[in-house]
Amino acid sequence: VKYFFDTDHLYATLLVFAAVLGIVFVPLNIAFISPFAQAFADFDITDLVFSRLRSDRSTTSDTSIVLVNIAHLPRHHIARQLERLAAHEPAAIGIDAFFRSPKQPSADSALAHALAKARHVVLVSKLTHFQPSDGVFDSLETSHPMFNRFAQNGFANVVVDSLAGFRTVRSFSPCERVRTHASVNEHLAFSVQLARYLDSNAVKRFLDRQNEVESINYRGNYSHFYTLDANDVLDSTTDLGFVRGKIVLMGFLGYSLAEPSLEDTFFTPLNERSAGKTLPDMYGLVIHANIVSMILQGMFINDMPVPLSMLLAFLVCYANMVLFHYLIEHYERLYQPLSIVVQLTEWVVLIFLLVWLLDQWSYKADFTLTLTACTLSAGVFEIYSQSLKPIVITFRERWQERQSKRSNDNITTVTTTVVHSQNIPTSQSTGEPL
């Protein structure tokens, strides 16, 4: 107990956080570190849960979602796909493609006619010109009005980590505010808009979480959903009856399923190479399918609040200072190896907890600050004990001397006042005048 309540431990802990701030805000431009930094800039330890642990287990497919490849088909062929799919009454059809301007009149007319006949169609939109001052987008890009008037819109923007040139998608925004004309309106994400048609209650539960950004709980790549190639849908002999009551997503899945492309592809946590990634692993359409699946199944990821992350880092760092103080007093010769063992043990335990919590409980803990504090704690403790503590002791002694002197001066003043007051007449208890 005597070690725990020691102000020196508090000062050393605060010094660790000062060092962390210095690391964060002081730019390091060291040439030989650059290649390593680029390789690991986009690395997240939690990616291993999706790329290793869950991929090793047979994750079940989501049969409520159907993916349809539109490849680079002309508009009249996409119209034919849409007509065939709509005839079997899916719950909703989402088209992850823009039709920004008129092309061939006959093809445009066919597509507009197919959109008009289909029920519950959602076309993608794109949010642009974000204004950080008020958190509003100034522009919403959509398809041409001849197509867009027959559909709802949902924005396809996702949250992308662009460090090191990668486009890793780990999260998305369910709802954003857009300034149109003189008013500001809320717009739902493409995936959220689609999910509403199949289960509005599930979407309500999702939106009631009121998170500005949601982590995506990936189910898997397109093999975890019903998937149809472009020609399969156009083939009149293909039975499409199974799409009834399901969510259908139409978009680019390569020139064909057998001929993949890098167009509209992203890095995700499912990428087998977590660090120093080479090729993106998932089409944008499949990312939307994973989000729809997560919402409908209610399999959300809960992120650790920032205040809790900071509190945990402070408590662990403070506990380290207490432990190091104990070790250096009782096992001084073994302090160096023991302190290293403590730090390594903490790293192993925290990383295990990080992975286990996400894998088993879909809880994404943020131990970045805690791990950084653990790494710096031993070195900072030694610096404080050997160099800064004598300065703190000197300052504390001078402050105490000054306070003691001020207290003695006050006592002298009070004593003098009391002595002088003895010669002053006082009133009588009878109330008679003096």
Where are these regions (language model features)?
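Non-transmembrane functional regions of envelope-associated proteins
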Residues: 2-206, 243-338, 342-350, 376-377, ...
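General structural signal for secondary-structure boundaries
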Residues: 44, 226-229, 283, 305, ...
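Low-complexity, intrinsically disordered short peptide segments enriched in small/polar/basic residues
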Residues: 89, 213, 230, 415-416, ...
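Intrinsically disordered/low-complexity terminal segments and short unstructured peptides
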Residues: 141-142, 155-157, 161-163, 167, ...
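Active-site Gly/Thr loop motif
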Residues: 208-227, 286
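Short clusters of hydrophobic/aromatic residues that line enzyme substrate/ligand-binding pockets
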Residues: 216, 233, 270
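A Trp-anchored, charged/polar loop motif used as the substrate-binding/catalytic surface
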Residues: 224-241
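Alpha-helical transmembrane segments forming the membrane-embedded cores
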Residues: 309, 330-434
